[in-house]
From Swiss-Prot:
Keywords: Cell cycle, Cell division, Cell membrane, Membrane, Transmembrane, Transmembrane helix
Top-rank taxon: Bacteria
Protein name according to UniProt: Cell division protein FtsQ
PANTHER family for this protein: CELL DIVISION PROTEIN DIVIB, CELL DIVISION PROTEIN FTSQ
Cytoplasmic topological domain: 1-43
Species, as recorded: Chloroflexus aurantiacus (strain ATCC 29366 / DSM 635 / J-10-fl)
Extracellular side: 65-272
């Protein structure tokens, strides 16, 4: 029987190498330790809050509860609320994604609308406030009377003739006019001023207040006199000269107050 001496030295070396390898391998912590560490550092709580926030944000953005359902229109007189709602299609849109200024922009293209505002209220309400143009003057051209607001914007052709006390400016040039067009604001301001000042301060009651492309604003009297004011500059001086001529009894059929040195003509036959 053959005897194999034990290789003690080699076994010791092999054992030491195994121990050295085991000591260099990283220690993998268990799930309990990882859970305790996550709770202690707040990472788990932060993750839970983040997930809940994502779900809440998704719900708020896309839930039907936060989509516009009710649209209220305030201030509409000429325009029907139904037409306004149709022009601003808000129903069904997520309330968070509605641009208030852009939404009402189509309304501002209407000749009836001077101002439009949109306010949103959670969870599903929209309120449109309309400031409509109010007719202040009639502008007559080509035999048609148009309603004009104080800013000079043409609203529409008048459905009924103006009343006796309404201010009507007659365009002797017969220039074409359409809704939404803005007229000469200086001419409108001057015409309103003359309609008040002439009868109340000078005692002259105009038979007609008109406008001409070349002359500007003019007035015709019951005696078939034509008084040209042009524009509103130096209005006080023009009124003073007119008042003096009327008080003096100076006869004239045509008076031009536009030049620095106004002039007048008197032709009983009415020609100028």
């Amino acid at each position: 029987m053959e005897y194999n001496p034990p290789n003690t030295r080699e076994r010791i070396v092999a054992r030491r190498q195994r121990m050295r390898r085991n000591s260099t391998e990283p220690v993998v912590p268990g799930w309990r330790w990882r859970l305790r560490e996550g709770l202690r550092s707040g990472r788990i709580v932060s993750g839970i809050v983040f997930v809940i926030s994502c779900f809440a944000l998704f719900y708020v953005l896309f839930s039907s509860r936060f989509r516009v359902q009710t649209v209220e229109v305030v201030g509409a007189e000429f325009l029907s609320p139904e037409r306004i709602v149709a022009a601003v299609p808000l129903r069904g849109l997520p309330i968070w994604l509605v641009d208030e200024e852009q939404a009402v922009a189509p309304l501002l293209t209407s000749p009836f609308v001077e101002e439009a505002r949109l306010t949103l209220s959670l969870p599903d309400r929209a309120r449109i406030v309309i400031v409509e143009r109010q007719p202040a003057i009639y502008w007559r051209t080509g035999g048609v009377d148009y309603l004009v607001d104080r800013q000079g914007y043409v609203i529409e052709a008048a459905a009924t003739p103006p009343a006796e006390d309404e201010l009507v400016i007659v365009d002797s040039s017969n220039l074409p006019v359409e809704p939404g067009m803005r007229l000469d604001t200086d001419a409108l301001t001057l015409a309103r001023e003359l309609a008040f000042v002439l009868p109340n301060q000078i005692g002259l009651h105009p038979a007609q207040i008109g406008w001409d492309f070349g002359l500007g604003v003019f007035v015709r009297t019951a005696q078939d006199q034509m008084i040209v004011f042009g524009r509103s500059e130096r209005l006080e001086r023009k009124l003073t000269i007119l008042a003096y001529l009327l008080a003096d009894g100076t006869p004239f059929t045509y008076l031009d107050l536009r030049p620095v040195n106004p002039f007048y003509q008197y032709r009983p036959d009415g020609s100028s």
